[in-house]
């Protein structure tokens, strides 16, 4: 109907929008695809741009790619989803951006220590099963393995027989603008709290969980 409506007194929405990044739209610079991959804190807004392999902080003075602080190439390689890369048809389904039942990213803020935690839950097929697996978008066991058997075997995402765990957790200190450490806990769900935060994990193990690109040395 070519009709324009203004909410309230119009003072807020009558102003032209301003870009927070000087980049073409086609670059999708600073895009966030993760529902749980963003958190607002007293130190600014932190969010994950998984497809670009970057992590940003926005504190009112433009976007700061904090992933560039000494870990640019590590995040560029290990932040994008390995599962989606192997199963492109899984993108935008109920199994991606879903760290509880599938794969996805989360961000949590510890208000006591002023530390931000970035968590990624991800899996990739073991080399022996590449080319034998297909993704089927359904409410349960969305991956089918077609081996020598005539009937395909339906499996869960992350089944340790068929998948390698690519999950990791890393912490960042906004005060010193530095990455602190990797952590061997990779939660399925993280929940904010007035003090620290909560995480859930249904499967525990005594095997050290190293981030991709690193190995555990007991000595």
What are these regions (language model features)?
Residues 1-218:
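Beta-sheet-dominated scaffold domains
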């Amino acid at each position: 109907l070519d009709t324009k409506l203004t909410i309230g007194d119009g003072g807020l929405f009558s102003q032209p929008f301003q870009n927070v990044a000087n980049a073409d739209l086609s670059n999708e610079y600073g895009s966030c695809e993760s529902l749980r991959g963003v958190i607002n804190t007293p130190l600014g807004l932190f969010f994950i741009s998984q497809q670009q392999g970057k992590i940003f902080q926005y504190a009112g003075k433009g976007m700061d790619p904090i992933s560039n602080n000494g870990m640019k190439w590590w995040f560029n390689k290990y932040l994008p989803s390995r599962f989606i890369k192997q199963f492109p048809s899984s993108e935008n389904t109920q199994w991606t951006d879903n760290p509880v039942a599938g794969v996805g990213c989360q961000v949590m803020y510890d208000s006591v220590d002023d530390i931000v935690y970035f968590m990624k839950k991800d899996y990739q097929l073991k080399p022996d099963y590449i080319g034998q697996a297909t993704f089927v978008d359904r409410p349960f066991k969305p991956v089918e393995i077609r081996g020598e058997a005539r009937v395909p075997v339906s499996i869960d995402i992350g089944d340790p027989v068929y998948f390698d765990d690519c999950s990791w957790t890393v912490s960042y200190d906004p005060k010193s603008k530095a990455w602190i450490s990797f952590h061997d806990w990779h939660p399925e769900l993280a929940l904010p709290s007035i003090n620290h935060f909560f995480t859930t994990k249904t499967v525990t193990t005594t095997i050290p969980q190293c981030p991709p690109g690193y190995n555990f040395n007991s000595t």
